[in-house]
């Protein structure tokens, strides 16, 4: 085997390995959403997360990849030359690998929205907007940054998706949850906010730990390979990713301890995710120390955003997806313009704190505003149309009964528990 073939094989394996870890994150998202919500909707949550990957894989292969990476203009790729990955028989191994790796990223962006709109969304509507995210919302945004589009030309940097995946998903989560409305009983007429606890914190914690593992594919494998200096960048990204997550978790634990008198379990778990989201854009360009600062700030922003969105804006987000992915994704995007200090990865930019002036910060801010506007405008149109058509939310009685039963004909995700409970009641 020649050196060139061996290098290609190693790079392909690296991307496939990372892609499998990112695919496994679907399990983590499913468990976080299920654990943080009520048991009567568990089966529905499982179906939604499976739908994201099923639809996402077919749709992204069909047209999404072409929209994202096809030759076109600064706004959109022209998909027809790349539809079905046209000419697959002559495609290089790395083309197939890149398709798989980007497919799992696309599915992740769609999955984020599921948590914020949990427990009251019509399954038909979910299938429609999940497909729309994979069809054009994510690919067009991705083209702007990763497909050679206009933000890429300006020097916008998002190494692994703080903006393209997480901020995009968080923005869609916000407009979707706001338009859909809250769960029954979440807010009273006199303005009181009721806590609706999840049914299994253990499942939620296991989901977070699985996501943490998956992030070691999400970020390091975004080098695109291990050759041409990729291994050095990947090694650094492992460290910055992990440090940011740990710093964010510690910060969240002490923040809630001081503010509420006890360290909050679910908030600390979300703190891990907030740190991971925040470091995803700058992880290749920042020092380990800077990654800790990014994690700390991300955690504080998340801790402030969750109660603000819940109690002030009255937007019901059962899992905190808007804050974790939207707010922390925005912070991570801006953090590039502040803390970027390593140009060895190929990005010709330095952050404000490292002598780069305001240029990089301005580009990152422009990119963030543009991507938020894209997701908010398109998402609002999509969700309003679904609501006007009577498809977006389920009927009140269906929500009360639980979506497992009304949407899927599943008596319970925990039938043994239901049988035991009913037996005790009949005694």
Feature names for model-found ranges:
Residues 1-427:
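Glycine- and aromatic-enriched membrane alpha-helices
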């Amino acid at each position: 085997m020649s050196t060139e073939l061996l290098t290609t094989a190693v790079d392909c394996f690296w991307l496939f390995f990372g892609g499998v870890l990112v695919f496994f994150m679907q399990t983590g998202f499913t468990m976080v959403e299920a654990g943080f919500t009520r048991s009567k909707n568990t089966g529905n949550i499982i179906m939604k997360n499976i739908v994201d990957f099923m639809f996402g894989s077919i749709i992204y292969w069909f047209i999404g990849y072409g929209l994202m990476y096809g030759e076109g203009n600064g706004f959109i790729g022209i998909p027809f030359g790349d539809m079905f990955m046209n000419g697959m028989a002559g495609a290089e191994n790395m083309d197939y690998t890149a398709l798989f790796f980007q497919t799992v990223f696309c599915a992740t962006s769609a999955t984020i929205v599921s948590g914020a709109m949990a427990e009251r969304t019509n399954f038909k509507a979910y299938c429609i907007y999940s497909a729309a995210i994979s069809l054009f919302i994510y690919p067009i945004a991705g083209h702007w940054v990763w497909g050679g589009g206009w933000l890429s030309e300006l020097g916008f940097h998002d190494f692994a998706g703080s903006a393209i995946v997480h901020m995009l998903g968080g923005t869609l989560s916000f407009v979707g949850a706001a338009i859909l409305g809250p769960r029954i009983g979440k807010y009273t007429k006199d303005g009181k906010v009721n806590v609706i606890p999840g049914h299994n914190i253990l499942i939620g914690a296991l989901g977070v730990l699985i996501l943490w593992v998956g992030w070691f594919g999400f970020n390091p494998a975004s080098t695109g390979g291990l050759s041409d200096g990729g291994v050095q960048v990947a090694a650094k990204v492992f460290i910055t990713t992990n440090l940011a997550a740990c710093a964010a978790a510690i910060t969240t634990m002490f923040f809630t301890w001081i503010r509420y008198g006890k360290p909050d379990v679910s908030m600390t778990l979300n703190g891990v995710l907030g740190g991971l989201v925040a470091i995803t854009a700058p992880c290749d360009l920042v020092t380990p120390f800077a990654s800790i600062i990014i994690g700390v700030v991300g955690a504080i922003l998340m801790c402030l955003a969750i109660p603000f969105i819940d109690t002030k804006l009255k937007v019901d987000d059962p899992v905190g997806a808007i804050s974790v992915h939207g707010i922390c994704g925005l912070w991570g995007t801006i953090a590039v313009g502040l803390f970027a200090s390593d140009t060895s990865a190929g990005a010709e930019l330095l952050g404000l704190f490292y002598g780069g002036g305001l240029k990089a910060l301005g580009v990152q801010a422009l990119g963030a505003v543009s991507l938020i506007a894209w997701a908010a405008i398109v998402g609002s149109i999509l969700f309003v149309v679904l609501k006007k058509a009577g498809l977006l939310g389920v009927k009140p009685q269906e929500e009360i009964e639980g979506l497992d039963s009304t949407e899927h004909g599943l008596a319970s995700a925990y039938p043994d528990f239901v049988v035991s409970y009913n037996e005790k009641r009949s005694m």
